[in-house]
Amino acid sequence: MNCKKQSLLPVLICTMFLLICFGAIAQDSLVIPLWQNGAPGFENRKNEPEEAKDWWVKNINNPSLTFFRAPQSIATGAAVIICPGGGHRTLVFNAEGADAAKFMNSIGINAFVLKYRLFREENTVYTMENTKQDVFRAMRLVRSLAKEYKIDTARIGVMGFSAGGELAGWLSYHYQENHFIKNDAIDALSARPSFQILIYPGPLVVPDSVSVTAPTTFLLAANDDTCCSPPVITLLQMHRKAKVPVEVHLYEQGSHGFNMGKRSLLNSLHSWPQRLADWLNDSGISKCCK
């Protein structure tokens, strides 16, 4: 009898492990459409399938947020919308979306990865304005979900990589603009992020000027990134002029697209997310407010 019980023990442990894993996967895969009936003006494209291969996703016609919930035991109440890069032609959803979200979860921050419409994709029907509508709607939508997901509305930020950094910057520096087609209760909410994180942001991120009401900002790039280190330097100068808090990390090497540093052979880049974690803590963003 004892032998039978012992033989069942590994099976029970394995079953419990699988249940935990599948529960985590189900939680990670919670997809929230930005508009229940599809993007305004493009409702008929809502059910067109996305294309995904290896590291990219494209043909996004029903923009959405994928919610990654921080473990309840360490949840701080903060949240961030993550905009992956991809040159507005594709989305680097895993390396610049899901990986970033899981890191945020590890330090107690809820994360929403944005799938936005791509205005440079081949044969696209979308414009830059449609892309802006997506990121503005995303911020307002997260605000509308704050009570349900136990999010502190004073600590909702935006993070972007490369082209996604341009979206984050459009939101942070132009949050007072509307960028919606039809009004509903969600569109009445503020689009202003409480903080922004720009990782090798594209050149379209740079505004004409930085307002004193712009959010506190974390900037990071490699100096040998000829595309996307210049915007970081320019934004630093603009933030200093406006006296808006900013922290900058400019690495000697790394070029473009090192993502969360996982595959980098450079120690400095491999550990860059820890610099972000330090800043989030020092800024009071990731400090628990239970």
What name fits each language-model region?
Residues 243-290:
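C-terminal catalytic histidine-bearing segment of alpha/beta-hydrolase fold enzymes
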Residues 92-93, 117-149, 262-269:
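Catalytic nucleophile-loop/oxyanion-hole region of alpha/beta-hydrolase
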